[in-house]
Amino acid sequence: MSAELIAVYKDEQIIDLESAKVLGLSDGVKALNGTEPIYFDDSPLALEVIRHSCAHLLAQSLKALYPDAKFFVGPVVEEGFYYDFKTASKISEEDLPKIEAKMKEFAKLKLAITKEVLTREQALERFKGDELKHAVMSKISGDKFGVYQQGEFEDLCKGPHLPNTRFLNHFKLTKLAGAYLGGDENNEMLIRIYGIAFATKEGLKDYLFQIEEAKKRNHRKLGVELGLFSFDDEIGAGLPLWLPKGARLRKRIEDLLSKALLLRGYEPVKGPEILKSDVWKISGHYDNYKENMYFTTIDEQEYGIKPMNCVGHIKVYQSALHSYRDLPLRFYEYGVVHRHEKSGVLHGLLRVREFTQDDAHIFCSFEQIQSEVSAILDFTHKIMQAFDFSYEMELSTRPAKSIGDDKVWEKATNALKEALKEHRIDYKIDEGGGAFYGPKIDIKITDALKRKWQCGTIQVDMNLPERFKLAFTNEHNHAEQPVMIHRAILGSFERFIAILSEHFGGNFPFFVAPTQIALIPINEEHHVFALKLKEALKKRDIFVEVLDKNDSLNKKVRLAEKQKIPMILVLGNEEVETEILSIRDREKQAQYKMPLKEFLNMVESKMQEVSF
């Protein structure tokens, strides 16, 4: 079955087998006329077809179990697929095994999946009395609607789908949630069931293992266990509290970045957190981003709490006159921003309402774009390398709706391409995916569980310099408009630390660990030596804790291990008398002894090993 053809691919579109036969693109066994075959396997294109059909299998099973069920949409998404529906019956996660069993029953029937094309009038008649399907049709232009059938079940859908339910053997329903109709909180709440499907048993097994591993590594769970951060309902949703250990971790990253930024010619700046609405009107945020902002009124003047740092940095630029000799100007700020996120999308540190960006804005001439972007790419590589992340880049080009001259866009886009080429970086192109004011590069990192995360962005902006009438004096003594490059490598400290926590499972590398060394005196007489050693380590900028509670030695060691501290030193008579330390080293997965002076030199060297 693994070699069976299930669809073809042409012009960036998946075409299922039935449609491909009609179009002369397949004979049912092989792809024809220059199309790419899609076989039944765990490749991305095949999984899209498999998961789409599994969503229909889910809907068919729900209809059999709950005859009054009505269905909205059931798309393929990054985490598998889902279906939104409603029923008068109460459904909980405890019902998922029952629904899954019914899906397996239908799959074993080996039902042919066929397609029918209806006019709008016919489709409205076919789904008469089904307000959810009518809602789907109202969002679709044109007069042709696909209806897919398997057994007695049929559903409005554009496809693509498998030719038969017999292919669906390896799937799992993963969770149940609520979802507003069409994502609009003013509409009724529907039930959403998520699932995953693969062509192979191994694919499903590996995925479920990763899910279990992800649960263990969940940053919200680790945040509590390791004392990194918390949330408080009395303060408000999406507003994290950084606890001492989490703040230490964050400060270490901030300090490493600051040192590197200064060496790379960036200047620290600081803008206010509230700015008059007048400047948000000039920037365009007031018209285009207002629903994501918070506002307040002071002395009858409206102010907006900043959702981004760019306007403040523009005002720093405007605080003085500039010539071409001053450029490029690189401003950075760990800028606290606030964005009005709906409560349903808030998720630990990954999606919050207050966060701090590692933000920088570069003001340069057009000719300097490539060299500046090249320097950012070099900086990005060093940061990702330090944290053991693999990463990929995606270049987004000019969208249909955009501002600026074609030649200017082409020149800016080519500058980004040349910078990527200079660093021999393979990159994807998102045609038309750029902002209306300039091309961009997105930085996507891959964690230890092979999940991809959007973090940093390098954005060329030809809009805000125009809106704010920015200028510098060029070599001909004429006023010229600079280009503005928005640049965040981590994205936000909150999001990056969430990803970092899950990537390492809380086992942070020594150079950023919130507690780097645990000192465990065996009894009271060893406590003085532990305190002296603590002071010596603190002078070397090491985060160290003395575990001196009246517990057994084994219990104190287990506590240090549970806190995922990289180095544990047990201090007894021998260590105090000889000053030869007994070290449990998590990173080396070894226990060894080392003279005190040598140990202090070693940890000092470890702190100097990492730089961006």
Curated annotation (Swiss-Prot):
Gene3D superfamilies: 3.30.54.20, Anticodon-binding domain, Bira Bifunctional Protein, Domain 2, Threonyl-trna Synthetase, Chain A, domain 2. Zn(2+) binds at C310, H361, H486. Catalyzes the attachment of threonine to tRNA(Thr) in a two-step reaction: L-threonine is first activated by ATP to form Thr-AMP and then transferred to the acceptor end of tRNA(Thr). Also edits incorrectly charged L-seryl-tRNA(Thr). InterPro entries: aa-tRNA-synt_IIb, aa-tRNA-synth_II, aa-tRNA-synth_II/BPL/LPL, Anticodon-bd, Anticodon-bd_dom_sf, Thr-tRNA-ligase_IIa, Thr/Ala-tRNA-synth_IIc_edit, ThrRS_anticodon. Binds 1 zinc ion per subunit. It is found in: Cytoplasm. Its EC number is 6.1.1.3. It catalyses: tRNA(Thr) + L-threonine + ATP = L-threonyl-tRNA(Thr) + AMP + diphosphate + H(+). Its cofactor is Zn(2+). The keyword Iron-sulfur does not apply. Keywords: Aminoacyl-tRNA synthetase, ATP-binding, Cytoplasm, Ligase, Metal-binding, Nucleotide-binding, Protein biosynthesis, RNA-binding, tRNA-binding, Zinc. It comes from Helicobacter pylori (strain Shi470). It comes from the Bacteria. Homodimer. GO terms for cellular component: cytosol. GO terms for biological process: threonyl-tRNA aminoacylation. Residues 218-509 are annotated as: Catalytic. This is Threonine--tRNA ligase. The keyword Ribonucleoprotein does not apply. One of its GO terms (molecular function) is ATP binding. The gene is thrS. Belongs to the class-II aminoacyl-tRNA synthetase family.
